[in-house]
């Protein structure tokens, strides 16, 4: 595929002692580690190609921006591959304007962080697990104006338990983790935050496999609330299995609770497969094999799918106790025709879903 991603010049180039500047040309940066710092900026100017990856921990007011390219093509893409950029317990993180390509694993892994703003970035990833953005136990997150072509999930919102003893036992003196397994992610959320206040807007998503917009399934008994996806476009989705379907999905799992989750003003183009929307109970990726506790107040509004290959969407509770309560569906259309009930050819709603309103 040829991607043409024009952008306006950046005239506000930062200077100062806290700025690491990458000018035009190729820079072999290796692993950029940022720990216990305030006010650090990495600036990639137009024409810069920075080779490496980022690990940041306990940083505040951290900014990575510019018009350059951050590329991990020279990093390990085999066993023990790491995310392209990894942030743990950071406050007021901003990533803006850059293009990220060829991640070995997750592109942006953001754990236990508050006040995250991601704006106008572009991602191109081809490898399995090349998720675009994975938010784990984060709060107060705004994602806007992105273009993401990832092999795996584009945006996923999760929660894991903090296992500080594991972190301590596998941390080297320089702050890096000696366990390079991709599953180290499970142990990095040192603060077990509830997950709330997310807005993901004005984005273009292409997922070769997996979801475009996903809440769950990893939850560890944590509450998810006030999550809104709106004014986004889905170009591609191919996942069509019984466990992980849905360009937009809420996977109610792992003893978590899920409420006030909205998908609004979403255009889904003629995807190769999968479902437009799916909300269901599952124990996929549940640490103790548990399903979710409950979900309530899920909104689908102004959802337009045009195509013939998507399979019917699902909204499924599991039992009277493990139910979905409060679903609002307004102007959900398939090829221009409105979906007006939960028993037609495009949407299935089972008997464990209560208080459904079609507007």
Regions found by a protein language model. Give the residues of each.
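Extracellular/periplasmic carbohydrate-active domains that bind, remodel
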Residues: 1-359
